[in-house]
Regions:
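Long, amphipathic alpha-helical coiled-coil segments characteristic
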Residues: 4-47
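Generic L/I/V-rich hydrophobic alpha-helical segments across diverse proteins
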Residues: 23, 30, 51, 70-73, ...
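Residue-level recognition of alpha-helical structural elements
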Residues: 8, 36-43, 66, 83-87, ...
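Hydrophobic packing residues in well-ordered alpha-helices of helical domains and bundles
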Residues: 19, 26, 44-47, 66, ...
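Structural secondary-structure packing elements that flank or coincide with functional cores
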Residues: 90-128
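Extended, amphipathic alpha-helices with heptad-repeat/coiled-coil or helix-bundle character
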Residues: 42-79
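Secondary-structure edge/capping motif, primarily at the C-terminal ends of alpha-helices
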Residues: 26-37, 58-61, 77-80, 102-105
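Histidine phosphotransfer helical core of two-component systems
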Residues: 14, 77-90
Length: 128
C-alpha cells in the first residue's frame, strides 16, 4: 500500500507544479494580450484552455476549490473579446487564489471556500 501512496503523492506534487506553471502562463498571456503584444482572440482561447485543464484536474488531486475557481474563470472569460487593464486585473484575481491554495497544499475549509468564491470577479457585476 505504501507504494500506491507514494505514487499518489508524486502525482499530486506533479499536479501542484503543473498548476503553478499554468498560473504563470495564464498571467503571461493576460499581460501580453492587455499590452497588445498578442492578438486577443488567440490569447483568450489560450486562457480558456488553461482554465479548463485546471478545472478538470483539480478535484482529482484534492483541490475542489481550485476547480471551482477555474470554472468561474472559464465563465468570466467566455464573453471576453479583448483584455484591457481592468479585465487583466480581474483575471489575475483568479490566478492569485489558485496559486495561494495550491501553494498551501490543501483545500481550505468550507466557510473559507464560500468567502473566496464570493470574492471572485463576475462579468455581471462589471456590466452593472
Amino acid at each position: 500500500m505504501g507504494n500506491a501512496d507514494d505514487i499518489v503523492a508524486r502525482l499530486k506534487q506533479d499536479f501542484i507544479e503543473d498548476t503553478l506553471e499554468r498560473a504563470d502562463r495564464i498571467e503571461t498571456t493576460i499581460d501580453r494580450v492587455a499590452g497588445g503584444m498578442d492578438k486577443a482572440d488567440v490569447g483568450i482561447a489560450e486562457l480558456r484552455r488553461e482554465a479548463h485543464t485546471v478545472k478538470g484536474l483539480a478535484g482529482s488531486f484534492g483541490f475542489p476549490l481550485v476547480g471551482a475557481i477555474a470554472h468561474r474563470m472559464e465563465d468570466y472569460i467566455a464573453e471576453l473579446t479583448e483584455i484591457d487593464d481592468l479585465e487583466a486585473a480581474s483575471l489575475v484575481d483568479f490566478t492569485t487564489w489558485i496559486r495561494e491554495i495550491i501553494e498551501s497544499g490543501t483545500n481550505p475549509p468550507a466557510e473559507e471556500e464560500t468567502r473566496i468564491l464570493r470574492s471572485l470577479p463576475t462579468r455581471s457585476a462589471k456590466k452593472g
